[in-house]
Amino acid sequence: MPLPAAAFARILVVSRQRLFNTRIIHTSGSGYSITQCRFYKTTPCLTHKQSQILDLDAPKSRENREKDGGKSKKSKKSIKWSTGSVLMLTIPVFAFSLGIWQTFRLKWKLDLIEHLKGRLNQTAQELPEDLSCESLEPLEYCRVTVTGEFLHEKEFIISPRGRFDPGKKTSAAAGSMLSENEMSSHGGHLITPFRLKNSGKIILINRGWLPSFYFDPETRQKTNPRGTLTLPAIVRKTEKRPQFVGQNVPEQGVWYYRDLNQMAKHYGTEPVLLDAAYETTVPGGPIGGQTNINVRNEHLNYLTTWFTLTLVTMLMWIHKFRK
């Protein structure tokens, strides 16, 4: 039964606010009551004729329905699992596992480098009589002592080579033939055959670094030690030809890299080379201590690559298969 107009005149309409539900609103003189009414936003009104009384139990506005619908859609997003999504997921998983593996490899390589550096400070031992590769390979970067004499007439130079001795960034030692401004990397390593006293075998000794303007033997005759002597040195192995480096030309005395077998064959020595220790440096002579622990370590670049690939492929996978 519809309410008479007089009943609506007693209903309080509040402008520009959404009110709470009220249980009972009584009207005087009519005997009617309204239960569980909902009040919504209305425009200001002076009389019941101007009032925009919203009907009972009115549905939600379109704006509210759209907002609620958007929230429900967002909350319902999930992964669209299928055979294709599972197969594509193996790409970031595989890349992540390789990144973890390279992390362990990096730690192993850093520990190896520290171990090799520690060998340089160990107590020197006698060079074994067995000079085979199998015997000397475990001694790489180990300190040894040798006794014998240099064969200066057969010396040669590997160049270009940089300096690696501890005194590279310090001033030249007193009496050295190098001034502070000459302590650059533009030079080479002086290799001199060395005849062992006990066995008579001839090995190769890297006496140290020389600047290029001292390559001529006539400029350093007074720096060549004579007679029998004992010196500490570091065991080294042969090296492969670096990329973009030319081939050695033994007939012309041109050496770019340390090929022990080629050197031994040309000069009639054993395929053994030792780096003279830094303390063997003589005033005005080559600078010893040119041992550079050069262990290839690209694991940091590898793990960065794999983890980056993991992130990119995972974001692509989520974008494609999340619905």
Swiss-Prot record:
Species per Swiss-Prot/TrEMBL record: Caenorhabditis elegans
One of the GO biological process terms: mitochondrial cytochrome c oxidase assembly
Pfam family, one: SURF1
GO cellular component: mitochondrial inner membrane; mitochondrion
Highest taxon of the lineage: Eukaryota
Primary subcellular site in the record, as a coarse category: mitochondrion
CDD domains named among the record's database cross-references: SURF1
The keyword Secreted is assigned to this record: no
Family: Belongs to the SURF1 family.
Name by which UniProt lists this protein: SURF1-like protein
Biased segments, Basic and acidic residues type: 57-71
Cellular localisation: Mitochondrion inner membrane
Keyword Disulfide bond: no
Lineage of the organism: Eukaryota, Metazoa, Ecdysozoa, Nematoda, Chromadorea
Function: Probably involved in the biogenesis of the COX complex.
Keywords: Membrane, Mitochondrion, Mitochondrion inner membrane, Transmembrane, Transmembrane helix
Residue span of region Disordered: 57-76
Residue stretches spanning the membrane: 81-101, 299-319
Topology in membrane: Multi-pass membrane protein
